[in-house]
């Protein structure tokens, strides 16, 4: 339990506890039953709150799930950075292998697919996702690439947003579209191929 | 109308016409109402057939939609090939710009998102998709890259499956996850970045 200021009213404390219970329930449930069968009723039952409590704070199950992902992200802290040992290729392989592990983890796989599905079909949710989750993560990646660019390891005219897409896009698409298994070897080869490019080097 | 062999029974002809009507209805409807609201009832009404006719041939709306995509693909012929002018970069830009146009076309956008969602959540459908749609398209792409590799334009040790992922994965992920607009300029820059790689060339 965290220490709380004395003037925090009990109601606000209860409200915060309910909120966390609801988000945890949504995240667990979507992993167990899938997004299609996720319901506000089910989340309410699992969290031990009334349906109306959920509807007071969120307009839809997609919105609940999205906040559940945000809560997960908060634990990682606002000052997150990718590793920087000076060896860009090794650092990126480490990060990409960790992403492979996460995507292969059954606790994350189904909730993340559910979120991706919602984003694919809902431009408004996609805009919120870009602003609150994808955007900040992208900045963290770009900061690492920028350091490499300053060190002369990346092309001077490289567009860092495109670089992020070329590094992470193939893995995410392979995962979402199930075009092949996600393995550490795939992660390594992806980094090598993106860094070196497809062209024959003369 | 195509010429038919004389011994084709009327029943088989009617059956083929119903099949095509159902698939066309499924494709049109998913674009209008989205996948969540697509129903066997709706497809049957639009196609002018009974629900039981659909259930006799397909177990689910996802299966109907998948066959609708296959029917669409059949029109493109089995001998499809990417352009080969000898200029790989120009040829790939042409292809990638055509993909951008297709993904931006409202007639295709929603049905293709619906199919992607189904694939993401259904490993069995994903396996059929890989075998019957993604696999053949991937072979066509690899054939063009192989020609470039033989011509000494691509790295000798390049894994062509990885090359396909690095070229197309970022665009497909950007489209599905709505991380940014799909433009001809994006298509061009993606090809250039994938071919040249991210590294500074000394």
Describe these PLM feature segments.
Chain A
Residues 48-58:
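Short hydrophobic/aromatic patch on the recognition helix
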Residues 78-109:
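Hydrophobic alpha-helical connector segments
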Residues 57-58, 129, 133, 168, ...:
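Tryptophan-centric aromatic hotspots in well-structured domains and transmembrane helices
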Residues 22, 37, 60-65, 75-79, ...:
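Short amphipathic alpha-helical segment with a characteristic S/N-K-E followed by hydrophobic residues
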Residues 90, 106, 110, 123-150:
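Amphipathic alpha-helical packing segments from all-alpha helical-bundle domains
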Residues 97-104, 112-121, 193-198:
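Helix-loop "lid/cap" segments that line or gate small-molecule binding pockets
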Residues 1-46, 63:
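Basic, helix-initiating cap at the start of DNA-binding domains
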Residues 1-9, 90, 94, 135, ...:
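C-terminal peripheral helix-coil segments that are non-catalytic and often amphipathic
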